[in-house]
Structure formats: structure tokens, C-alpha cells
């Protein structure tokens, strides 16, 4: 009888623990949206909260390319379209509502430089050609930028193959970014972590 009672108590405790875990999981699921590619979606408010804990790195793909569109070019044919510039500006306004303090680094292409310029409404920027080359060395390059920025938040304008590489390497997911899509990372103790996909709003 005693053994049966002990087993019953243990089972009740197990069920209570299991029920508690399910409640926590349900709560987390209701608070965080997920992209179809398996990446958590991070909006401006969530990004701002993360930035209070660690320096954040937001990597954007450039705006609409002129040489792959029938839309009007902003200027140079290797740059972005007028529509792309306007989209970048609107995105920059939404972004700055939650993150005002950041350093800006585009790769050394006309399309990324124009995208960064319109995104930030003319904020000073530093071109970094290493943001064009994506592979295992990209993390060291990002950490170098963080050190230059004295661990401030940084925004990088780069290319689709860079974002695809990071998503696959860090989380094992396929990410095929559209124009101005972005990934969010944070730095902690010298390491970079991929938090998810930035979703304005």
C-alpha cells in the first residue's frame, strides 16, 4: 500500500511538472511569431528590448536593384531603383522609431551604399568591402565592426548570399531574402548569435 501511495504521489508530481511545462511552452508560442523559414520574427519593440541587453547587429539586404528591374533607376544603373530608395527610407523611419543609436556599414557596392544612405536619411556611414564576401570569415568581420563601434548597435547593408549563409550556418534553415529583408544578431562575450528575422512593425 505504501509503495502504491508513493508511486501515485510521484505520478502526480510528474503530471504537475509536465502540465507546467506545457503552460510555459504555450505562453512562449503565443508571444513569438515564427517565419515560414523557421526563424523567429523580431519586430522593432523586441529588437529594442534585445538592444538593452546586448549590442545588436542588423544585416539588411540592399533595396531593389536597378539592373534587375523595369522600374526607374535612382541614378547609376548598378544602383537601386527610385522605388527601392523610397522603400529604404520608409523602412529606416520605422526602424529608427525603436533603434536610434547605431553605426552604419554598407558593403562597397553602389546598391548597398545607396540603400544605406536612404535608409538613414543621410547619416554618416563607413563602407566596408568585407561585407561583400560571405563565408566563415563574416563573423570575424562583424566582430571587427563591433569593436570599431565600441560595442554600439550596428546596421549592415549587404547581399542576399550573406544572409542565406548566416541563416544556414547558425540555425540550419533556408533563408532566401527579398529586398530589404534582414537578420538580427547579437554579440555576447565575443560570440555572435542569430536571433531571427527582422519584421518591421
Curated annotation (Swiss-Prot):
Cellular component aspect of the GO annotation: periplasmic space
Superkingdom classification of source: Bacteria
EC number: 3.1.3.-
Enzyme class: hydrolase
Localization: Periplasm
N-terminal signal peptide: 1-35
Any Gene Ontology biological process: lipopolysaccharide metabolic process
Principal location: periplasm
Keywords: Hydrolase, Periplasm, Signal
Alphabetized InterPro entries for the sequence: His_PPase_superfam, LipoPS_heptP_Pase
Pathway: Bacterial outer membrane biogenesis; lipopolysaccharide metabolism
GO molecular function: phosphatase activity
Function: Catalyzes the dephosphorylation of heptose(II) of the outer membrane lipopolysaccharide core.
Family to which the UniProt record says this protein belongs: Belongs to the phosphoglycerate mutase family. Ais subfamily.
Protein name per UniProt: Lipopolysaccharide core heptose(II)-phosphate phosphatase
Organism the protein comes from: Salmonella paratyphi C (strain RKS4594)
